């Protein structure tokens, strides 16, 4: 169910903009085939939902024959950035990943090759893991240019006795976005300035830094899990969207496809509390995404600033509950309080939009 201004993940958009609406649908339906003979690995994953049929994973890998903990992979697989990108969808405590993850890492996966390095289990550094690779940069679509993006993460994970566990990671993304026009826009103060690129087919750099941390422990209340992640950097997008490329053909040389380079900030927190030994879990999530940290409030939409609703920040408070019938079946109810930055100069965003969402989901995993 969504309020009148909401966007839901299943079904069509609202047919009556003055009223709330509801939709029923298949959000995810996946089947994964995996192979592992100790040295060679491979996987194919297919997704079926109310939008059609597509593939999710398609990769092969070769492990080192000595420790079998380091690996070289090639194909389509999760991008090694942060913690939530690679977190299993079937284990998510909220219906969707954080806003900035959905915007910057559509489908979570990309075409590429990645090297994973880990020491043997008896080493004092066995809790460390380094992932680094080169990727096409436009999700699971076919590659459209000759530039490759670098993505890497150094992570650590370690148990604390038999009662707790911690983890942390630092991630880096260095890539480029294709600009099909002769113009591009960059921030100067609180407004965009137009740059003449001199030719079509140039590129603008996108660069992200990420930090993530996880901590879980057991107590008389049950298992408590805390997770946090933050990203900062620059993201080229178009006037109408700050999302990462997610297309299978290069955009055309049209004014609306000119790139805007935005400095961004995004972060999110999870608190998941199992209720003792019962099958219930309570979930609290806070999610913030500011696509342009150089402007705020009524600076957005100002005359000759070239800013728009795309530059407004958004945040979400999510509250939910999970009931695990068994290890295969779980029921999830989750309510999202969505908030947007307001500007008197952006039509439709003078006040907070009515776009809260209630999701009730039944999941079966086998």
Residue ranges with predicted function:
Residues 1-139, 144-151, 155-162, 172, ...:
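Outer membrane beta-barrel
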């Amino acid at each position: 169910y969504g309020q009148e201004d909401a966007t839901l993940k299943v079904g069509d958009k609202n047919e009556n903009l003055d009223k709330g609406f509801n939709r029923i649908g298949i959000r995810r339906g996946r089947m994964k085939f995996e192979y592992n003979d100790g040295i060679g690995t491979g996987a194919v994953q297919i997704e079926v939902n109310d939008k059609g049929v597509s593939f999710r994973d398609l990769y092969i890998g070769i492990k080192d024959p000595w420790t079998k903990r380091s690996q070289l992979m090639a194909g389509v697989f999760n991008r090694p950035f942060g913690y939530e990108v690679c977190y299993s969808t079937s284990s998510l405590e909220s219906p969707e990943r954080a806003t900035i993850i959905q915007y910057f890492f559509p489908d979570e996966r990309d075409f590429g090759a990645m090297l994973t390095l880990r020491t043997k289990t008896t080493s004092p550094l066995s809790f460390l893991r380094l992932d680094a690779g080169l990727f096409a940069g436009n999700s699971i679509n076919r590659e459209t240019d000759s530039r490759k993006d670098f993505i890497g993460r150094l992570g650590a994970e370690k148990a604390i006795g038999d009662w707790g566990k911690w983890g942390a990671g630092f991630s880096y993304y260095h890539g480029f976005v294709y600009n099909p026009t002769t113009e591009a826009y960059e921030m100067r103060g609180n407004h965009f300035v137009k740059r003449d690129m001199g030719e079509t087919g140039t590129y603008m750099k996108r660069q992200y830094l990420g930090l993530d941390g996880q901590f879980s422990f057991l107590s008389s209340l049950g298992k408590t899990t805390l997770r946090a992640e933050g990203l900062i950097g620059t993201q080229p997008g178009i006037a109408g969207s700050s999302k990462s490329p997610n297309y299978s053909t290069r955009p055309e040389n049209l004014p609306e496809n000119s790139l805007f380079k935005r400095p961004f900030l995004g972060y999110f927190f999870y608190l998941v509390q199992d209720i003792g030994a019962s099958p219930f879990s309570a979930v609290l999530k806070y999610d913030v995404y500011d696509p342009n940290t150089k402007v705020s409030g009524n600076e957005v939409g100002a005359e000759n600033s070239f800013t728009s609703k795309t530059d407004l920040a958004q945040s979400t408070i999510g509250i939910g509950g999970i009931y695990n019938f068994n290890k295969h079946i779980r029921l999830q109810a989750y309510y999202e309080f969505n908030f947007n930055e307001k500007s008197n100069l952006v039509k439709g965003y003078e006040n907070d939009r009515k776009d809260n969402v209630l999701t009730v989901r039944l999941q079966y995993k086998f």
